[in-house]
Amino acid sequence: MNMPLMIDLSNKKVVIVGGGKVATRRTTSLLAYTNHIHVVSPTITDTLQKYLETKQITYEKKHFEPQDVENADVVIAATNQSDVNNDVGAALSKNVLFNHAGQADLGNITFPNFLKRDKLTISVSTDGASPKLGQRIIKDLKDTYNEDY
């Protein structure tokens, strides 16, 4: 069972394995909270390439190897290959925060939908049961809590 928790990522090393759409979404979300994001993937999206060019992320063009996640505080497995995502999880020590983008129950953290308005943060999670519902709830909350909050 997951408990909502706010965490300071500013000094945490984040490694994202994968360079596609899901990895891009996770990276985009995390950039507001840390500048220590390292991506490992044979290819990356245009958006990730732009982040690399503007020095917002670091990148290794390669296939995953267990040593890629050594010394990481947060690891996200976001490839389109479940066996690689599973290998990422297997390479981690128990104290690492791990998100398995393909199967949330194989990780120990998830990414809820959230709304941020200055000091107000509202997160919504369906524990993976209905991501569309979570998105709809956040959309409704955006209408209620506009940029003035």
Name the predicted role of every residue range.
Residues 8, 116-149:
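Adenosine-phosphate binding glycine-rich loop
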Residues 1-9, 111-112:
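A short, basic/flexible loop-to-alpha-helix module at the beginning of a structural domain
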